[in-house]
UniProtKB/Swiss-Prot annotation:
Pfam families: Ribosomal_S17e
Top-level taxon: Archaea
Keywords: Ribonucleoprotein, Ribosomal protein
Entry keyword annotation includes Secreted: no
One biological process term in Gene Ontology: translation
A GO molecular-function descriptor: structural constituent of ribosome
Matches recorded under Gene3D superfamilies: Ribosomal protein S17e-like
One of the record's GO cellular component terms: ribosome
Protein name: Small ribosomal subunit protein eS17
SUPFAM superfamilies per record: Rps17e-like
Source organism (scientific name): Methanobrevibacter smithii (strain ATCC 35061 / DSM 861 / OCM 144 / PS)
Name of encoding gene: rps17e
Record family assignment: Belongs to the eukaryotic ribosomal protein eS17 family.
Amino acid sequence: MGNIRTSFVKRLAKELIETHKGVFTTDFDQNKKLVMEYSTVSTKHLRNKIAGYVTRLVRLEQTQE
C-alpha cells in the first residue's frame, strides 16, 4: 500500500500538467527540475512529492493511449 497524497499536491500537479502540456516526462529527476522552475514550492520534500505525482500521472496518461 502506498502513501496518500494531499489535495494540495494533487491540485498543483494537475495544474502544472495542464498549463505546461508536453513538457513533463516519465523521468522523475527531470520532473523535479521542471517543478522547481514552474512553481513556487519552497521545500524539497513538497517538490519531490509533486514531481512524483506528476511522473505517475504522465505514465498513466501514456498507458491509456
